[in-house]
Amino acid sequence: RSQGGDLYISAKLDERTDITYWFRRCMFNELYTFYRVGITRNRTALPTTQPEAEPAVLLNSTYSDNIGPFAIPGCGWCGGNHKYRERTARTARSEGYTLLADGNRIEGDTTLWANRVTVEAENVILDPTRPYRNAAGGEELRDTLCRESVTYTVRRNNIEVTASHRFCNAAPVTIAIYYGMQSMFEGETHVLTPGGAYTDWTEVAKASTFTKQEHPLFRRYVEKNRQGYQSTWLLPDEIG
């Protein structure tokens, strides 16, 4: 269901349960991405026709970055959910988005059935090395660091994400870190990282960070909470 610029999706998990998704402009920078993922009780054969309803179980909520930000030495983070130097100025903006159902463009407010829903979002990441003062004396970023294209493909209980960046900065910029993926699974208690540092279930409080250089075969990050599991998979192409 597309309604007022928001996109609501429901899909069957089993005969008693649906998964629901809510896409909208969100995070501090108002980028179009998935805002909420949850589970709804539904014993009918078809997915719920009210995917906008509050889910019985919240799986993901966008309280941080679900689109990778860049860390620029001396300038902090830009993109995703980040403010310039974590103060008040935005570090990215939405240039627009396209919604498709089975490859056909969704126009206006509508409700329909589909096997695959695709969201194509276009964002601009602003250059934090070139801040300005606006008329009110506040900080503002205006120059483009890169143009970010993100495609979300939703099938049943899976969101496949591909992102690309076309850099058009006016002067050289050093990127120290790029977070290609971040999970915001609610209430996680244990993690498992096959090929990584945690090859058995490990309590979240006892888990720490590790690098891809240390564990080059690592690609899957599995989380567990009291309701179920979530698995995040890095694709083998480019940086994942």
Where in the sequence are the language-model features?
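Beta-strand-rich N-terminal accessory domains
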Residues: 1-89
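Residues that act as N-cap/strand-start positions at coil-to-secondary-structure junctions
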Residues: 3-5, 144-146, 215
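Coil-to-beta-strand transition motifs
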Residues: 16-18, 30-32, 143-147, 154-162, ...
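Trp/Gly-enriched beta-strand surface patches
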Residues: 197-240
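Acidic (Asp/Glu-rich), glycine- and aromatic
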Residues: 146, 158-198
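Extended, loop-rich substrate-binding clefts of extracytoplasmic carbohydrate-active enzymes
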Residues: 64-155, 170
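Generic recognition of long tandem-repeat/solenoid scaffolds
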Residues: 5-12, 19-20, 30-36, 115-130, ...
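Short, surface-exposed beta-strand/loop "edge" segments at domain boundaries and coil↔beta transitions
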Residues: 13-23, 41-51, 125-139, 171-174, ...
